[in-house]
């Protein structure tokens, strides 16, 4: 299969059955491999939607720098798209982010502004918003935490793909970062069948897992907790890494791997049948 541009390779990621971890033959566990997106994460979807929305609204100009607070994946996706679409990009991120992510951002031509690691992504958001407010002609912030295009990306792509490939879905479990995946895909699932359970995974307060957040510390405007049926706390991330790598051959990054155990716990302990 050939594509005109790399943008056409975003989305339509496969579902993989995790049969080893479900001792009950009436319960099917599927993982959606968002790492198959060109920049390696689900954030490719929202980056494309936010960029196209900003272009339609006339917010992007060649002389204006796109600025985004990010722990890594959204920034990487925006850096790639900015390079491809002819814009400059600056990632504002905690100094605690990995060297590998910084190198990848620079490889895409992005500038990086590091903020105090103790403040995490929340402080990076404050810094980015302040800079944009003080320099509106120099910077534009797409703001994944407030941007409705984030939710729309999952409502129009992630959700429909899952319904297409797993039409009998009974439970949808996803991590809580910006909340976009849960709000967008979850809304579609509820419209399709109100009985589908939408479950959020969040880290414990003070966790340093990049890409996920405990919503008591900061509640993104696009996220509505009441839209979820319930939430679960993360398990041990080291154990999750080993599980994903050794049993399923998935080289998962930290945010995905740490979601694996609570998702599987739902299936093992609480379901007699389901998908």
PLM feature spans:
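PLP-dependent amino-acid enzyme catalytic core
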Residues: 1-275
């Amino acid at each position: 299969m050939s594509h005109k541009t790399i943008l056409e390779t975003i989305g339509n990621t496969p579902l993989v059955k995790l049969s080893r971890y479900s001792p009950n033959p009436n319960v099917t566990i599927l993982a959606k491999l968002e790492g198959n997106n060109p920049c390696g994460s689900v954030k490719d979807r929202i980056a494309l939607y936010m960029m196209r929305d900003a272009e339609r609204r006339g917010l992007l100009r060649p002389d204006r720098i796109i600025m985004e607070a990010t722990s890594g994946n959204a920034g990487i996706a925006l850096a790639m798209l900015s390079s491809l679409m002819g814009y400059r990009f600056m990632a504002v991120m905690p100094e605690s982010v990995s060297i590998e992510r910084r190198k990848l951002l620079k490889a895409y031509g992005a500038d990086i502004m590091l903020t105090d690691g103790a403040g995490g992504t929340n402080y990076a958001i404050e810094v980015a918003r302040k800079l944009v407010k003080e320099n509106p002609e120099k910077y534009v912030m797409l703001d994944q935490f407030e941007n409705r295009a984030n939710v729309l990306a999952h409502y129009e792509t992630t959700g429909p793909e899952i319904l297409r490939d797993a039409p009998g879905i009974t439970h949808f479990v996803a991590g809580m970062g910006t909340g976009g995946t849960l709000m967008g895909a979850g809304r579609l699932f509820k419209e399709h069948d109100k009985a589908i359970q939408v479950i959020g995974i969040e880290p414990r307060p003070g966790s340093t897992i990049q890409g996920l957040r405990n919503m008591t510390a900061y509640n993104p405007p696009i996220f509505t907790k009441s839209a979820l049926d319930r939430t679960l706390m993360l398990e041990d991330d080291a154990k999750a890494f080993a599980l994903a790598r050794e049993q399923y051959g998935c080289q998962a990054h930290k945010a995905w791997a740490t979601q694996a155990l609570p998702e599987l716990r739902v299936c093992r302990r609480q379901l007699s049948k389901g998908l």
